[in-house]
Amino acid sequence: MSDVSVPLTFSDVAAAKVKTLIAEEENPNLKLRVYITGGGCSGFQYGFTFDEEVNEGDMTLVNDGVTLVVDPMSLQYLIGGIVDYTEGLEGSRFFINNPNATTTCGCGASFSV
């Protein structure tokens, strides 16, 4: 996939954290899978998990040697978004800066469109 048509951004900070976590797990086949499910206080919620598989139709992005995977259904809600990572007083977490979200919950884990 060329950079011109990439509908989602995988930040350098998030990629660095994924790289660290993969090294800790000692499994170079792991990829960060981002997905959307129904639920949460705003209607949809973000999910993050490690996966060794890339399914047919999945979009992949590579940054700093690590791979982000998104299924087609989830991608439609994430177009134009940024997958990022933060560490602060509230803890550390992956999050998505999603321009499609019309409302988000206080913790940023769920949204509506």
Swiss-Prot record:
PROSITE patterns: HESB
Protein name, as recorded: Iron-sulfur cluster insertion protein ErpA
Function: Required for insertion of 4Fe-4S clusters for at least IspG.
GO molecular function, one term: iron ion binding
Similarity-based family: Belongs to the HesB/IscA family.
Cofactor stoichiometry and binding remark: Binds 1 iron-sulfur cluster per subunit.
Keyword vocabulary terms for this entry: Iron, Iron-sulfur, Metal-binding
Origin species: Aliivibrio salmonicida (strain LFI1238)
Iron listed as a keyword: yes
UniProt-annotated binding residues for iron-sulfur cluster: C41, C105, C107
Gene name for this UniProt entry: erpA
Record SUPFAM superfamilies: HesB-like domain
PANTHER family from the UniProt entry: IRON-SULFUR CLUSTER ASSEMBLY 2 HOMOLOG, MITOCHONDRIAL (PTHR43011:SF1)
Highest classification ranks of the organism: Bacteria, Pseudomonadati, Pseudomonadota, Gammaproteobacteria, Vibrionales
